Design a protein with these regions (language model features):
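N-terminal secretory signal peptides that target proteins for export/translocation
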Residues: 1-15
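Beta-strand initiation motifs
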Residues: 34-40, 79-83, 136-147, 205-219, ...
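Short, conserved, GDST-rich strand-edge loop motifs in beta-rich repeat architectures
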Residues: 120, 176-194, 252-254, 258
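Bacterial N-terminal signal peptides
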Residues: 16-29
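Conserved blade-ending motifs and adjacent loop-strand segments that build the rim/top face
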Residues: 343-363
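Acidic, Gly/Ser/Thr-rich repeat motifs that build Ca2+-stabilized beta-propeller blades
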Residues: 33-184, 232-235, 240-248, 300-338, ...
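Beta-propeller blade signature
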Residues: 130-138, 190-202, 258
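Surface-exposed loop and turn segments in beta-propeller and other repeat-based domains
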Residues: 85-95, 146-159, 202-223, 267-298
Length: 387
């Protein structure tokens, strides 16, 4: 606070007394203010090979963890990390490719179905995103009868921008993010899967109400388009609407709410530039007619990845927050939400210096993270309490 002082002696004394009074009020307020909660981190597992995704099994069966090099493992409290589960598909593990997401069927208690996304090599040596499912055996040692039901067409990647995130909506629809394989204009071509979010039934069929289901040559699986490399996908538990995030180039990481049939701009609309610092050649600005604006974006890219909405009861200070991992800036980002608006941003765990790949809310109300390193970790994160 700045006080405008008169230069007479009497007024100087008045303002000095007023300053002392205000200072005492500020000190008293700070003395009774609630302390900032301390974030507590527990390392549950290390030695993981670039872990990418995790999924909680019910009834304390453990946590499934994918490693990008092609292994699916089972972590259980108090037990050694499992050997790789059998029945997992072969993967293209070059560059950003490999075994990517693991997700459970909404009816896992009945069907024990496990979904996996991965980079799959084609006949010409290039790769694309693929998704399939199999049945986790009762022993948790194998995925049986794995069947691929979605393949990105055509396969164009030489190791970049696969997407690969999976999430179910409340109606059971399966959303899949598909990167543009670092070939920008494919994201605007509806005859290609590149740079899209697709929606399928749990059995891999095209829902009749998909926006391009009867609009050949558009791919009927497409839900939304104009995406670069979507690395986060989560259902908003309060609105029941799917949210996604994606990497920009140099700047322009985004959070979006993908709506059926809408164009999210890449590469025509972007808040980023090329890694060289030069403009994106196809870009027409940050706001382009016919494209949707992000809910939130960063001018300097954190390298956002997995994300999760905090809807648990354990830590009230985190209610109505969206947590996102940051690969480049090596932090956990907390966004405070008011409806669909971001009203505050907080950075956590930056002192650890670890690339945070996946973020999940556990059934116990703690946040679980995977760090994308050759010695990757499974972390459990919470707030210190007086309880």
């Amino acid at each position: 606070m700045t006080l405008l002082e008169n230069k007479t002696p009497a007024s100087r004394l008045y303002f000095q007394l007023l300053k002392l009074l205000l200072l005492s009020v500020f000190v008293s307020a700070s003395a009774i203010a609630a302390p900032v909660p301390t974030v507590m981190v527990t390392e549950l597992q290390n030695g993981l090979d670039h872990p990418w995704s995790l999924a909680f099994l019910p009834d304390n069966e453990g946590i499934l963890i994918t490693e990008r090099s092609g292994q699916l493992r089972l972590w259980q409290q108090g037990k050694p990390l499992s050997e790789p589960l059998k029945g997992v598909p072969a993967v293209y593990s070059k560059g950003q490719g490999g075994l990517l997401e693991v997700a459970l069927s909404p009816k896992f208690a009945q069907d024990r179905r496990v979904y996996l996304s991965f980079a799959e090599e084609g006949k010409d040596g290039k790769a694309g995103t693929a998704v399939g499912y199999g049945r986790l055996n009762p022993q948790g040692t194998a995925v049986e009868n794995f069947t691929v039901f979605f393949r990105q067409q055509p396969k164009l990647s030489t190791g970049n921008h696969f997407g690969g995130k999976l999430a179910f909506d409340k109606q059971g629809g399966l959303f899949i993010t598909v990167g543009e394989n670092n070939q920008r204009l494919t994201a605007q071509d509806l005859s290609l899967h590149q740079g899209k979010i697709v929606r399928l039934t749990p059995n891999g069929k095209v829902p009749k109400d998909n926006p391009f289901a009867n609009q050949s040559p558009a791919r009927p699986e497409i839900w939304s388009y104009g995406h670069r490399n979507p690395q986060g996908l989560a259902l908003n538990p309060w609105s029941g609407v799917m949210w996604s995030n994606e990497h920009g180039p140099k700047g322009g990481d985004e959070i979006n709410i993908p709506i059926a049939g809408k164009n999210y701009g890449w590469p025509l609309a972007t808040h980023g530039v090329n890694y060289s610092g030069l403009p994106i050649p196809e870009a027409k600005g940050t706001h382009v007619d016919g494209t949707e604006q992000p809910v939130y974006y960063w001018e300097k890219s954190p390298g956002i990845s997995g994300m999760a909405f905090y809807d648990a009861e354990r830590f009230p200070a985190w209610h109505h927050s969206l947590f996102i991992g940051a690969l480049a800036q090596k932090e956990l980002i907390r966004l405070q939400l008011d409806g669909d608006k971001v009203v505050a941003e907080e950075r956590l765990l930056g002192d650890r210096g670890e690339r945070i790949r996946d973020v999940r809310i556990g059934p116990d109300g703690y946040i679980y993270l995977l760090t994308d390193e050759s010695d990757g970790k499974l972390l459990k994160v919470g707030l210190a309490t007086n309880n």
